[in-house]
Amino acid sequence: MMNNSNLVFKAIGFDADDTLWNNETFFQETQSKFRKILQEYPLDEIDQKLLNIEKHNLQVYGYGIKGFILSLIETSIEISDQQINGKQIGNILDLGKKCFSNQFIYLKMLKQLCGIFIKNTFYY
């Protein structure tokens, strides 16, 4: 068993999205708009196909907006049996561009939390 009393941390990192600001809302809004682009296909099939493709693509693209948008495009191609048109793909790309321009809303108590860490940090 390890003795934790000798542990010294040089840095603490935060995975910022959904930890320091609300990011998930943007993904949900984008997915809702994506469903409208593919409204001629069954909603439950779209959602399930997207979820499966996103999970598979995590190994390739990782997390984030770019991987999400590429997964939306791949989903649209598969769900439409390659019948999706260029205008619809363009609309999906526009959704992605909008994701990058969203203003983040910092989660409550962020300033207080950062202040606590700064106040209790020891510099060597």
Model-predicted regions and their roles:
Residues 2-51:
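Active-site neighborhood of HAD-like aspartate-dependent phosphohydrolases
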Residues 40, 44, 56-98:
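A metal-dependent, Asp-based hydrolase signature
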Residues 86-95, 99-102, 110-124:
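Substrate-recognition element of Asp-dependent hydrolases with the DxDx(T/V) motif
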